[in-house]
Amino acid sequence: MARIAGVNIPTNKRVVIALQYIHGIGPKFAREIVTKVGIADDRRVNQLSDAEVLQIREAIDADYQVEGDLRREVSMNIKRLMDLGCYRGLRHRRSLPVRGQRTHTNARTRKGPAKAIAGKKK
């Protein structure tokens, strides 16, 4: 099993698909990395040599922010919005939808399970 960016990627899958197991690398970036390194699209991870895996690892380290660094940056961006006290930060702080969705009837995923209100029986 090849280990890239701290993630064990599956060996029996194609390289483009296996790279998507790394947080921060989707289909577009996976194809970009494979073409930059010069690996064919239909190659599987178990067919790669150690040198090719090292090239992939170096390409990811040089150009992309993945895994822990990316998660840390996203959480710091949200924390910065909350500290500023802007509208988006307030919505994050109250666990409400941030991008203008309606909340009167929907948004159960973001708000959590419905809370019972006393005196609402028929």
UniProtKB/Swiss-Prot annotation:
Q: Which InterPro entries match?
A: Rbsml_uS13_C, Ribosomal_uS13, Ribosomal_uS13-like_H2TH, Ribosomal_uS13_bac-type, Ribosomal_uS13_CS
Stored PROSITE patterns? RIBOSOMAL_S13_1, RIBOSOMAL_S13_2
Record keywords: Ribonucleoprotein, Ribosomal protein, RNA-binding, rRNA-binding, tRNA-binding
Keyword check for Ribonucleoprotein? yes
**GO BP field:** translation
Gene Ontology molecular functions: rRNA binding; structural constituent of ribosome; tRNA binding
What does the subunit section of this Swiss-Prot or TrEMBL entry state?
Part of the 30S ribosomal subunit. Forms a loose heterodimer with protein S19. Forms two bridges to the 50S subunit in the 70S ribosome.
Family, per entry: Belongs to the universal ribosomal protein uS13 family.
What does it do? Located at the top of the head of the 30S subunit, it contacts several helices of the 16S rRNA. In the 70S ribosome it contacts the 23S rRNA (bridge B1a) and protein L5 of the 50S subunit (bridge B1b), connecting the 2 subunits; these bridges are implicated in subunit movement. Contacts the tRNAs in the A and P-sites.
Protein name per the record: Small ribosomal subunit protein uS13
| Species | Brucella anthropi (strain ATCC 49188 / DSM 6882 / CCUG 24695 / JCM 21032 / LMG 3331 / NBRC 15819 / NCTC 12168 / Alc 37) (Ochrobactrum anthropi)
